[in-house]
Regions:
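Nucleotide/pyrophosphate-binding catalytic subdomain
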Residues: 1-115
Length: 115
């Protein structure tokens, strides 16, 4: 039986350094070609903050966590599901990896409840 895939987080700050992205993709390519299976989840904090600034939407944080009103959530989804997701897929494909990018919203994959 195959082992379960390993989940790896690729942070938004790491994405701002092109050399780190290339090294990460190269390492992932080597591991996949050796038979490894992975799910990569990505961040995007700096990218979100940059778009919010361009849109003149003020970021609010409580205990280090971003508070997301409707306008902020729309911007977050644009950045994560659009810009960042596509960039990560493109990076990996450039290193010969077959991959796809999905959002937790796609097909109701993930649902959250506010407590």
């Amino acid at each position: 039986m195959d082992s379960a895939p390993v989940v790896i987080k690729y942070g938004g700050h790491a994405m701002t350094v092109p050399e780190l992205g290339r090294a990460f993709a190269e390492d992932m390519s080597g591991l996949v070609h050796e038979g490894g299976r992975f799910i990569v989840v990505h961040g995007g904090g700096p990218q979100i903050s940059a778009l919010l600034k361009r849109l003149s939407i003020e970021s609010h944080f409580v205990d280090g966590l971003r508070v997301t009103d409707d306008a902020t959530m729309e911007a977050v989804e644009m950045v994560l599901a659009g810009q960042v997701n596509k960039a990560v897929v493109g990076l990996f494909e450039g290193y010969g990896l077959s991959c796809c990018g999905i959002s937790g919203r796609d097909g109701g994959l993930l649902k959250a409840v506010v407590e």
